[in-house]
Amino acid sequence: MSTHMIDVSPATATGTSSGATMIGHGEEPQLARASAYFSALELFSIGIGPSSSHTVGPMRAARAFADHLAATGRLPDVTRVTCSLYGSLGATGLGHGTPDAILAGLTGLRPETCDPRDVRASWSGLAEGATLTLVGSHEIPISKSDVSFEPRTRLPGHPNALTLSAWAEKDGVPLFEETYYSIGGGFVRQSGDPIEVRPSAPQPMAYSSSKELLALCDTHGLDICDIARANDESIHGPEKLDAGLDAIWDAMHACVETGLHVEGTLPGGLGVKRRASGIRVQLEKLDRPPEPGHDNATEWLHAFAMAVNEENAAGGRVVTAPTNGAAGIVPAVGHYYLRFVPGANTAGIRRYLLTAVAIGSLVKANASISGAEAGCQAEVGTACAMASGALCAVLGGTPRQVENAAEIAMEYHLGLTCDPVGGLVQVPCIERNAIASSTAVSAALLALNGDGTHIVSFDTVIETMRQTGRDMMTKYKETSEGGLAVNVTVC
């Protein structure tokens, strides 16, 4: 499996919708967590839209399933592959392009390297008598009915679950079957895998809480980005890390630029028009000096975020940050830094990304970054905390000011539901990213105006978010069964 076969202690959803059925494989084993830190090259993952949990994760699961069939010599015997989508995947998978992603993964495509155009309509465009070539070498018949949607069936490992089954001719039982959980941010694990954080290598600056992270900064006289760099260099080495960070930023920048220059209507049937390009045209006409505090700084920030999320909604190339639904915030605030902060440079962007990862890792390790598990507070709230703390850092903030900025940003989003209209990552997702980008900047500036002393710690707000997600009703967690999803008329 890929490095994305990793999990953390999830928030257990207790508020289920009526009629839901729990099935599965018993309790997952819980192992001790050595460190909260996830590599920047894992938490930031180049992929495709519109969803890290419903598109990127399922594609990785399907590719892993097909690879296993090939590696075990079963591939020549396979005559059919079926897939069952459970819980949130079953509820909103159609709008998120999950079946398309699964078929693309079975053919051997990877979200990191595929052409997004090769994924679109893989399933939805199937004609009668269609065939599928498993990992490019074994052809089988395929039909839309081979993918089933079971939103009322919830497996205990995670709300986002799917089971892939390979069948041989005339056999009444699967030749091979595996259940996967798409746990947010493109991370996937198999049923039976231990719920744990598994660092790729021993980390010299391991920490499991913001309290421990700040203590490391105090002890060694380092900034948060230095702690992150030490851990990441122990995994990848300095050259690979810097090359990876630069590639991540290049992908973020390319996504912003594409989104700023494309017009039209987003797919899916809601009739949502792209707005980032129009905002860019208006701002360029204003021709104001690009300085912080000028009226157009906030407008540019909104345009940057919307550009990313419009590209994501169209199934384009995006970077999970830490998810696709919240992918616009970290790039938008990074572009704000480069455009409006004197002296901003590439080295600053690397510090920005590393600080963001150190913050996001804490949330992933101690709560969740999955909207299906804890609502939009886990996605947009986490991304806002990452961007706010990271901006505070590159503006000269101390580690305690950085932690304060992250806490303010996350605190603001507590209780935010995930209620996508029509099961699409468009309404309210695109505008939420724009406003959360503004919130990230405001929280960073507010923290910089203090000395880092505050009542609520980032650890406390993470735990509060976890508890809130646990208590949140399932209909508000990426099922499109509540909130705006049922109150907005879809024609």
Question: Predicted regions span which residues?
Answer:
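Alpha-helical support elements that line or immediately flank enzyme active sites
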Residues: S53-A70, P331-G343, S388-G396
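Hydrophobic alpha-helical bundle architecture
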Residues: A344, T355, S361-A434, L446-I455
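Conserved phosphate/anionic-ligand binding catalytic regions in large, soluble enzymes, centered on
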Residues: F44-A62, A314-V333, C376-A385
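Extended hydrophobic packing segments that form well-structured cores
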Residues: I455-C491
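C-terminal regulatory domains involved in ligand/effector binding and gene-expression control
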Residues: P111-P289
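Accessory "access/gating" subregions that flank catalytic or transport cores
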Residues: H236-G375, G483-C491
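Glycine-rich nucleotide/cofactor/substrate-binding loop typically near the N-terminus or early
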Residues: G87-G129
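N-terminal signal-anchor module of multipass membrane proteins
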Residues: R33-I48, A64-F65
